[in-house]
A protein has these predicted regions:
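Solvent-exposed, non-transmembrane regions of integral membrane proteins
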Residues: 1-213
Length: 213
């Protein structure tokens, strides 16, 4: 319940303050990592206590294993993934992302260039609150140019880097994109999701499921 509440708060923060703020305040906070560790311990204890393997309850066993793998994927992302911020103004291009490590900020060079064509902010009718914001981009990579759009639920993938719409400049002439490069953590997490689907199917149609009993 507390973990779910944390995810809900993170979603709210991400919508109104940007992805970077949600990561700093919730996703990468010590309390959130503690909750994830306790969830892993809880999944293991439940699997042992109810003897899922001994009773051949493979569906539930796979589901619990998938949750553990998903959380391990999140930990791998935190430890080994590269996180940064790309700030760019309309009509400008850059290949530099700002990476913060403690109190120190360094700049890493991307193997391609990103150009901001236009930033668009949409507000709720009769309100100053943003309902969505979108970046229209040109990505110059390997001698070719890609025309891309990044907004709240549309992520850009280029050479292992993922770009998320995070924030924008007060004058609405510039965008802030959250950049993530995390192939290992992402693959572990996707494996966990695949196992989750398999586990749910086994729980429904397996030999010891309620439907087959």
């Amino acid at each position: 319940l507390l973990y779910g509440f944390g995810l809900a708060v993170a979603t709210f923060i991400e919508k109104y303050h940007g992805t970077a703020a949600a990561k700093a305040m919730i996703y990468y906070s010590p309390l959130f990592f503690l909750l994830q560790f306790l969830l892993v311990v809880n999944f293991i204890v439940i699997a042992v206590k109810y003897q899922y393997c001994k009773l051949h309850r493979w569906g539930l066993m796979v589901v619990h294993t998938s949750f553990i793998i998903i959380l391990l994927g999140a930990l791998t992302s935190f430890q080994f993934g590269e996180e940064g911020i790309l700030h760019i103004r309309e009509g400008e291009s850059t290949d530099q992302i700002a990476v913060r490590q403690g109190d120190l900020t360094t700049f890493h060079t991307l193997p391609f260039t990103v150009e901001l064509v236009k930033f668009t902010l949409t507000r709720y009718p009769g309100s100053s609150s943003p309902s969505s914001y979108e970046s229209e981009l040109l990505v110059h990579v390997d001698g070719k140019t890609r025309h891309e759009h990044v907004f709240m639920n549309n992520v850009l993938d280029v050479k292992g880097y993922r770009f998320f719409q995070a924030s924008y400049d007060p004058d609405e002439q510039g965008t802030v994109l959250s950049v993530n490069r995390d192939v290992a953590g992402r693959n572990i997490t996707y494996t966990g999701y695949l196992l989750l689907v398999i586990g749910l199917i086994l729980s429904l149609v397996g030999k010891n499921s309620r439907f087959m009993a």
